[in-house]
Swiss-Prot record:
SUPFAM superfamilies reported in the protein's UniProt record: GST C-terminal domain-like, Thioredoxin-like
Binding site for glutathione: 15-16, 42-43, 56-57, 69-70
One annotated GO molecular function: glutathione transferase activity
Function field: May be involved in the conjugation of reduced glutathione to a wide number of exogenous and endogenous hydrophobic electrophiles and have a detoxification role against certain herbicides.
Family: Belongs to the GST superfamily. Tau family.
Domain GST C-terminal, first and last residues per copy: 92-219
Record-given protein name: Glutathione S-transferase U16
Pfam families to which the protein is assigned, alphabetical: GST_C (PF00043), GST_N (PF02798)
Protein induction: By the fungal pathogen Verticillium dahliae.
Intracellular or extracellular location(s): Cytoplasm, Cytosol
Record bears the keyword Transferase: yes
Keyword Cell division found: no
Enzyme class: transferase
Amino acid sequence: MGEKEEVKLLGVWYSPYAIRPKIALRLKSVDYDYVEENLFGSKSELLLKSNPVHKKVPVLLHNNKPIVESLNIVEYIDETWNSSAPSILPSHPYDRALARFWSDFVDNKWFPALRMAAITKSEDAKAKAMEEVEEGLLQLEDAFVSISKGKPFFGGEAIGFMDICFGSFVVLLKAREKFKAEKLLDESKTPSLCKWADRFLSDETVKNVAPEIEKVAEFLQELEVRAQSAASRS
């Protein structure tokens, strides 16, 4: 693409959303500078300037032009460095539509239920949210079997758009298993998805950018302690 370009990624180390562009950039062999934002402190001027609407990570800066929202960033990376490595999005329009549909399902239906189960104080609300989480995993199991057609990933032989989207939450699920003794990916219910998750975490691209499961589990415990402390003061 001619002269050397400036690529910078603003993120938070544990964020599933920040993992997504990291994977995409590595798949495309793009060199970039990473800037870690302070989760509990003041947001940087660069972040506030780059994403004034939502004021959150991740943000990709490409030659000082900001691109926001994690999956939007992944698509941008795929289209901008389209001569580097295979396409992240499927080549066929129908397959692209499926990948976007299931990615939207993960972000706007499945993960909100998981988040609700984690933060609600109501046992009834937690039970209802966990039902939605488990039902969603069954639906994703069926989607994987249908879309992968016996291949290792949603994207076929290699990690693709939907793998990046849902895979970004696998570390969080594994961390919850350690922190809460809560096994959501169950071999007896979602066998194909469980094998896919192991393959995803074992992929060299993912291993190089994903946070350590133990470290995330410790961080989740720290967050719970903070929440309990705040609740006791209110």
